[in-house]
């Protein structure tokens, strides 16, 4: 009998055909599912920190504040397969893709800047920032046709241990959401740094500028002796001045302080940063005194506060600020976002001086809310000043290398119960009656440490960065605070599987099921043949 017409051969042929069909079907289904999973972001985030998942806080913030009427273009400066092969870049990619999956007005593109450098040329010109293959650019066009963009380096998306420089967390969600909100605003509010007072253009100013930039400000510098503040200015920053501000007199027509007064009258905000080495500047300090801010001095020497029990350094001068717990106070309201965390972050004040009672202000205890504050009222002007951070009760004041005695502290007004311990940061609010039953406000925030904004202090290990964004949100009329938590790694090692190992696992997981089916088919065919 011809073997081709035998019953065994027919059964074997059917089994083999069925096996081949099943294998082909498995491969086809796998290819289709892979394509759909990539398009629709079907994946399970198995990291303990949910690195690849957008938090509910980020989704809620975007839902409330993101302008969906503007087209946003996110540019990765490398091809997608290269991004997927890098653990760090893959985190950034998945964050952006998950956001883009929620909003149709976000387009994501991949550009090889080495073969197509012109694709990012305009961004380089606009931002004056270096752009490389690891850069991520978020861009949109405002109502005036002007480009608004934010350029992120890969390093800026991660948090590092300040002592070991090891990666400890992923902060891309905060960076990207902030950028999306910033570039889609109809008009960016301006933050101006004052110049021409001996300010040293050091790294601390650069880091503070970056915080304001990320928060949504167009950051500029201004010489108030020669220029007026732009109409869109919402914040003026006075940072570590070494010479005085000019006030109008018979020999001088320039009046910087009059410009600041008018600016604050228009319901805007000022930040001032001083320290233990800030010289006596009579004009500026008269202005600050009017706003409840007075630098504490002993015999014309600024105090330097040593808080050994709450210091990050053995010298005792890198002080951890104590949160204000007085209910109902503006200082407590400003830090509520930090204190509401399960483990509130430390806010650090390196090399800090202190503030004392300002002339003309009266200390008040709001018995209903238990909040201590200072109040001022004269000629229709009403201001209240609140501490935001203080030292511990054990802190010491040093002047000229010597610890001050109690009698010396009393002589400079540092025994008032409302300001003990020493004040590191204060916020003053001026109240404006709009005449229609509503109120509006002007603000001045003063910090007694210029190192408050140094790189290590703004690391997401501490709360300095978030505190500044909360302050911008409270004081700025046109600024949305973005203070999403960093995702800290359970291990400081970002990934322990290489790209080649991942490829091997993929091949194994794809081939093993298909091979098993093939082998089973062969076994069945042989058994039936010899049955």
Identify the function of each model-found stretch.
Residues 2-531:
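Short, surface-exposed patches at the edges or C-terminal ends of soluble domains, predominantly
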């Amino acid at each position: 009998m011809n073997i081709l017409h035998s019953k065994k051969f027919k059964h074997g042929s059917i089994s083999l055909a069925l096996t081949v069909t099943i294998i082909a079907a498995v491969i086809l289904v796998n290819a289709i599912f892979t394509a759909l999973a990539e398009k629709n972001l079907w994946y399970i985030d198995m990291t303990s920190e949910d690195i690849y998942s957008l938090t509910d806080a980020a989704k809620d913030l975007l839902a409330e504040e993101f302008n969906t009427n503007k087209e946003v273009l996110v540019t990765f400066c490398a091809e997608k397969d290269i991004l997927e092969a890098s653990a760090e870049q893959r985190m950034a990619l998945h964050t952006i893709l998950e956001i883009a999956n929620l909003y149709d007005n976000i387009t994501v593109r991949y550009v090889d800047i080495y073969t197509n450098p012109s694709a990012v040329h305009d961004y380089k010109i606009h931002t004056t920032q270096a752009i490389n293959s690891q850069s991520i650019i978020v861009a949109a066009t405002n109502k005036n046709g002007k480009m608004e963009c934010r350029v992120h380096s890969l390093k800026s998306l991660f948090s590092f241990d300040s002592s070991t420089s090891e990666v400890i967390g992923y902060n891309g969600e905060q960076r990207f959401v902030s950028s999306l909100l910033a570039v889609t605003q109809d008009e960016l509010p301006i933050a101006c740094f004052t110049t021409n007072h001996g300010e040293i253009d050091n790294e601390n100013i650069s880091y503070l500028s970056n915080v304001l930039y990320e928060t949504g400000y167009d950051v500029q510098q201004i010489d108030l002796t020669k220029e007026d503040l732009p109409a869109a200015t919402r914040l003026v920053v006075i940072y570590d001045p070494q010479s005085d501000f000019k006030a109008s007199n018979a020999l001088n027509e320039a009046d910087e302080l009059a410009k600041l007064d008018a600016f604050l009258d228009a319901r805007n905000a000022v930040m001032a940063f001083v320290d233990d080495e800030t010289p006596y500047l009579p004009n500026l300090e008269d202005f600050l005194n009017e706003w409840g801010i007075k630098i504490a001095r002993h015999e014309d020497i600024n105090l330097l506060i040593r808080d050994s029990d709450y210091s990050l350094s053995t010298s005792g001068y890198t002080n951890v600020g104590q949160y204000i717990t007085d209910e109902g106070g503006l200082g407590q309201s400003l830090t509520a976002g930090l204190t509401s965390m399960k483990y509130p972050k430390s806010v650090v004040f390196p090399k800090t001086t202190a503030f004392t009672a300002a002339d003309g202000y009266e200390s008040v205890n709001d018995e209903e809310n238990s909040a201590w504050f200072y109040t001022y009222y004269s000629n229709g002007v009403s201001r209240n000043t609140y501490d935001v951070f203080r030292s511990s009760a054990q802190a010491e004041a040093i002047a000229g290398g010597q610890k001050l005695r109690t009698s010396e502290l009393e002589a400079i007004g540092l025994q008032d119960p409302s300001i003990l311990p020493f004040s590191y940061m204060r916020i003053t609010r001026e109240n404006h009656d709009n005449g229609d039953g509503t109120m509006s406000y002007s603000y001045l925030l003063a910090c007694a440490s210029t190192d408050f904004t140094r790189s290590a202090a703004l690391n997401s290990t501490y709360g300095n960065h978030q505190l500044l964004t909360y302050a911008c949100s409270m004081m700025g009329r046109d600024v949305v605070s973005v203070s999403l938590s960093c995702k800290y790694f359970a291990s400081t090692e970002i990934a322990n599987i290489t790209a080649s190992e991942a490829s091997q696992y993929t091949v194994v997981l794809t081939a093993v099921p298909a091979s098993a089916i093939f082998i089973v088919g062969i076994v069945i065919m042989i058994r039936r043949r010899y049955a």
